[in-house]
A protein has these predicted regions:
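Active-site-proximal alpha-helix that buttresses catalytic centers in soluble enzyme cores
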Residues: 2-82, 106-107, 120-127
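Extended, charge-rich low-complexity interaction segments
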Residues: 104-112
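Active-site catalytic microenvironments for nucleophilic, acid-base chemistry
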Residues: 38, 61-65, 93, 112-116, ...
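Glycine-rich phosphate-binding loop signature in dinucleotide/nucleotide-binding domains
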Residues: 41-43, 91-95
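Short alpha-helix plus adjacent loop in nuclease-associated cores
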Residues: 79-91
């Protein structure tokens, strides 16, 4: 199984509007397009995204850049404060998927998949793209192949 995890691009500052409604900035859109270039030619089967506006915009930019035909799948289990265990429950039957989400979930999820605990989250900048590989999406059972920051 291969799994890609993408943090949304740079968004409007906190307080500009309610957190779920914060949009990408022009710089954030550029960051996302640079990260999307690393997914060209990858065997993606699905793109899952948080319902927050900035994650939806990020996922749509990636979809368009790749010419990815299937629709985006919007899920509530990719919001910022979701526990990584809940994400793993949803990935049991998945392969070659992209998750578009937020910190702290992105960093916690990457640490959990590698180490099996939450004590060592990864540091992921906006539009950072992580690639993991393993037999199954289990805590401590996946290897981080790298994190690309735009």
């Amino acid at each position: 199984m291969r799994l890609w995890v993408l943090r949304h691009g740079e968004a409007e500052p906190y307080g500009a509007r309610p957190d779920p409604e914060r949009a990408l900035t022009a710089h954030g859109r550029e960051e996302v397009l640079r990260s999307a270039a690393h997914l060209i030619g990858q065997p993606l089967t699905a793109i899952y995204a948080s319902p927050y506006l900035r994650a939806q915009q990020t996922a749509q930019l990636v979809r368009e850049a790749l010419g990815f035909q299937p629709e985006l799948i919007t899920v509530n289990w990719l919001t910022p404060d979701t526990q990584p265990q809940k994400v793993l429950e949803r990935l049991e039957d998945q392969d070659n998927v992209l998750l578009v989400s937020h910190n702290p979930l992105v960093g916690s999820l990457l640490g959990f998949l590698q180490h099996g605990h939450l004590q060592h989250p990864e540091q992921v900048q906006t539009a950072g793209l992580a690639e993991l590989e393993g037999d199954l999406p289990l805590a401590g059972a996946m290897k981080l192949k790298g994190i690309r920051h735009p």
